[in-house]
């Protein structure tokens, strides 16, 4: 039973695209969704982070198993609106595409999940189990919305979790983690004409960076067996086969020194320098390994001068490659998207890191949502209209099939 027309489904997406949630104000989407769901007798609860940022939790059905479905409400900055062909916060329907900030990443996926819930509720299609919607704040920054929901127990009883990020018709059973590490070197300032009276923080930090580069090289020489296989994702996006060495990068541990700052002016010995690293963790080389590695190199180079801070750390999430969610997606989705579904690990990260940690409870897990991932964060972001609409039906069938397993 279809409750909403095609025009209704597009209008609902337009309504939440109009709400400007550039790294803030998700509570307005929460209030909109709460009102929408109440029209169909679906109870929901707003879980606040602060006055302007909040999550929304809603449920249909009852009892076990519990399937959590999740999407984030925040979007990245739209930049200069003059660079857009169409206004970024007005949904524009043109040439089979729905343009607007967040259409792909990921208000399209979120609204597809919400509509799927509504239509399942109205048709009394759920014979057993619970669908729990977790609409989150702050995914594009530090995942504090997802972490709050995890801390308050909303994931404690779940059997499965689907994240509706845009996946280009790829079903992800796992993804890498991500860490930000900031190394600071503190020396002693002096005039450049008398450098021996100071301690050059840049020199110290360069020594650290060079030694860490060698450590990373040594790690990659042994990083040959991977629990997470990201090769199918990469080969689909690149439209070519990749070699063994490339596969060890995509499926393995990755560390990048992306920022280096030191010194204030040319005629002074720099007293402070900082290097920032982004680290993509995997089960074989996790956050504990990374912390120990940084501390080891600091001890060797100069622990009296160097410190490390880790402002963010999100674990890799792994599940069985053929878990029941993945099985249902690969069986059902081709009927609607008219292509086979590739199964892969994801090289990025999602709210699942905060929801599940390292997934010690072996929750069935999938990242699968409408939209082409390459469109995320782009000027003139769009989602194909047919993809958005078809995923509503995909979700309905997948949710129902999973709960009836």
Swiss-Prot record:
Entry's EC annotation: 3.5.1.18
Cofactor: binding comment: Binds 2 Zn(2+) or Co(2+) ions per subunit.
Gene Ontology biological-process entries: diaminopimelate biosynthetic process; lysine biosynthetic process via diaminopimelate
InterPro entries in alphabetical order: ArgE/DapE (IPR010182), ArgE/DapE_CS (IPR001261), Bact_exopeptidase_dim_dom (IPR036264), Peptidase_M20 (IPR002933), Peptidase_M20_dimer (IPR011650), Peptidase_M20A (IPR050072)
Reaction it catalyzes: N-succinyl-(2S,6S)-2,6-diaminopimelate + H2O = (2S,6S)-2,6-diaminopimelate + succinate
GO MF term (any one): succinyl-diaminopimelate desuccinylase activity
UniProt keyword annotation of Plastid present: no
Family statement drawn from the similarity comment of this UniProt entry: Belongs to the peptidase M20A family.
Name this protein carries in UniProt: Probable succinyl-diaminopimelate desuccinylase
Name of the encoding gene: dapE
